[in-house]
Regions:
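An N-terminal, well-structured beta->alpha segment
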Residues: 4-105, 194-231
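Gly/Ser/Thr-enriched, mixed-charge loops and adjacent short helices
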Residues: 13, 35-40, 44, 153-285, ...
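Conserved phosphate/anionic-ligand binding catalytic regions in large, soluble enzymes, centered on
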Residues: 40-60, 145-148, 234, 238-250, ...
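Short glycine-rich or small-residue beta-strand-to-loop segments that form or flank ligand, phosphate
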Residues: 87-93, 233-236, 412, 551
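N-terminal small/polar loop signature for handling phosphorylated ligands or for N-terminal nucleophile
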Residues: 89-152, 255-313
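Short Gly/Thr/Asp-enriched flexible loops that form oxyanion-binding sites at enzyme active sites
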Residues: 101-109, 152-159, 309-329, 365
Length: 576
């Protein structure tokens, strides 16, 4: 019989399995029934980014016990696949408890007879993806909550191709985790014993050389960089995360000399003392970087999130002297067009090239891909599905991957890794900036040229945060309402068709014709609107949020902005 949240709480407070510090934290909650319920009403669940939750005691929190339990389920699955000798690579970011969680995961795997390769200190998430492939591991783990607030941590699982887990592995691992119902089923061992048995292995700094070498291979015109380096000023902040060493190293080795790092944010620190939310998508994270940019008169300003898989960009508009914030769509399309154009020019474009993006990423990608005779493949939200496509291309030979991007500031050039990679994005964007600087243009000038050529595409995102069990239920109710009462019009836009990825149906509202979406089942609703507009609704896979995405195509930037605002208003008013 399943215990209720109260019984589970009492068990955690009294069972000798749990340490005294955990018990004390929980006893201090006595009388706060809502907090107790929130900590114990469910197990943390996998979403698009794996396991993620607030750090603390409880089944619905990130702690050594939930990490071990998750890892035991993973271990059982690996053993069923006979993957124990291949082993598991493990990395972590700068967050509170990240090193401890990484070590606990390793020792749980070791106790199950599975080899582990743990990075000796914090590393970017994409380097872990590369390590899984390079070391021939069956799986990988990254302890990170990416760009979430400081109270959070998380646990992402990768499979042997180096991408985050997708079907069938994600469902199968979940099923194994669900079977670990008693903590007595969870194995662990002492580090000394694990080392003595050759199970607990450390990855040192020499491995970084291999990773950096892969990044540098993606450069198309390295010869331009030394020529422009002295005139190009770059401001960079790692936002207290893992990006500082690899980003600065790859820029230095390519020949960029004018790189200014935000001193106050250089050191890894899981409390993120200078930012409330260490996310390059949040303008509040840019205060110190923009201050430094103005002091040194920087050409471009860059920020990576704590696990260095996302890149944010600001660039100077020389006409006004102001810095313009680029969305992930804008920076991604600048890199994408540069790669497609220059690889075509230099004769290095593979046969049947493909650009891969998520369904909520800009429609400009379709126009750019068409210009360079490149297939555009759309996948569900989450970079793991882009990684999955690369594997599919490898297996079938249908296409050759050239570049992949998502609107949420993530992209990947090359196939050495299978997750979004901020160090390679920094490197490519700085090369793009040097290329245009040689022509007397800024990145903003280049972006305006793209708008002129392909159309004024503009995208937006509105997010509603609803925490706790009440929030979870409200989000479900909102999705149910959209399904039961599908809109025929959103603002000034007629709905031409809608896609319900959960039900695997696309319905044309004019003809009533239905067809498959062609993508896996996911709790996502997508509305195709007239005039090249669209919007999409989905609950976040990693946070207590519901997200509304919008996209339009205008005749000018002003026209696109007006259309976007109208769509945003219509969609969020329906929600309210």
């Amino acid at each position: 019989m399943t215990m209720g949240y109260r019984e589970t709480y009492e068990m955690w407070c009294t069972d000798p399995y749990f340490d005294d510090k955990t018990k004390e934290e929980l006893r201090n909650l006595a009388g706060d029934e809502k907090e107790i319920e929130d900590r114990f009403y469910r197990q943390l669940e996998f979403g698009t980014g794996g396991l993620r939750g607030m750090i603390g005691a409880g089944t619905n929190r990130m702690n050594i016990y939930t990490v071990r339990q998750e890892t035991q389920g993973l271990a059982n699955y690996i053993l069923a696949q006979n993957g124990q000798d291949k082993g598991v690579a493990i990395a972590h970011d700068s967050r509170i408890m990240s090193p401890e969680f990484a070590r606990e995961a390793a020792l749980c795997l070791n106790a199950n007879g599975i080899k582990t390769y743990l990075f000796e200190s914090l590393r970017p998430t994409p380097e872990l993806s590369f390590a899984v492939r390079e070391l021939g591991c069956i799986s990988g783990i990254v302890i990170t909550a990416s760009h979430n607030p400081r109270e959070y941590n998380g646990y992402k699982v990768y499979w042997e191709d180096g991408a985050q887990i997708t079907p069938p592995h994600d469902k199968n691992i979940l099923a194994e985790v669900a079977k670990v119902t008693e903590f007595s089923m969870v194995k662990t061992m002492e580090e000394d014993a694990a080392r003595a048995e050759g199970l607990f292995n450390i990855i040192g700094t020499d491995f970084d050389d291999k990773y950096i070498a892969q990044l540098k291979k993606q450069s198309i015109h390295p010869e331009i960089i030394p020529e422009m380096a002295k005139d190009m000023k770059i401001v960079y902040t790692p936002l207290h995360g893992t990006g500082n060493i690899p980003v600065r190293r790859v820029l230095r080795e390519l020949g960029f000399t004018q790189v200014y790092v935000v001193e106050e944010q250089k050191k890894p620190d899981g409390t993120f003392p200078t930012v409330p939310y260490p996310n390059p998508e949040d303008e509040n994270a840019w205060t110190l970087a923009m201050k430094l940019a103005k002091e040194v008169d920087a050409d471009i300003v860059l920020a990576t999130d704590p696990d260095a898989d996302r890149l944010g960009v600001h660039t100077k508009d020389t006409k006004t002297g102001e810095y313009i914030s680029f969305t992930g769509n804008m920076s991604g399309m600048l890199i994408a067009e540069y790669i497609l154009r220059e690889r075509t020019k230099t004769g290095t474009m593979p046969e049947n090239p493909a650009l891969v993006e998520t369904i909520v990423t800009t429609d400009m990608a379709k126009a750019v891909a068409a210009e360079y005779n490149t297939a555009l493949i759309e996948v569900l939200t989450g970079f793991k599905y882009i990684g999955e496509q690369i594997r599919h291309f490898d297996e079938t030979g249908a296409h050759h991957y050239v570049f992949g991007l998502e609107e949420s500031y993530g992209c990947l050039a090359g196939t050495y890794a299978r997750d979004k990679d901020a160090p390679v994005a920094v490197m490519m964007l700085c090369e793009v900036a040097a290329y245009y600087k040689k022509q007397g243009k800024t990145l903003w000038d280049a972006m305006l040229d793209m708008y002129e050529k392909y159309g004024y595409y503009k995208e937006g995102l509105a997010t509603v945060t609803l925490k706790g069990i009440d929030g979870f239920q409200k989000i479900q109710a909102m999705m149910d309402d959209f399904r039961q009462n599908p809109p025929k019009k959103l603002g000034d836009f007629e709905v031409l068709a809608y896609r319900d990825y959960k039900e695997d149906v696309r319905k044309d509202l004019a003809t009533g014709k239905t067809e498959s979406t062609g993508l896996p089942a996911s709790n996502v609703l997508y509305y195709e609107l007239e005039d090249n507009a669209w919007c999409c609704v989905r609950p976040s896979g990693t946070e207590p949020k519901i997200k509304f995405y919008f996209g339009v195509k205008g005749t000018s930037l002003e026209d696109a902005s007006e259309k976007l605002e109208g769509l945003r208003k219509a969609m969020t008013e329906k929600e309210a």
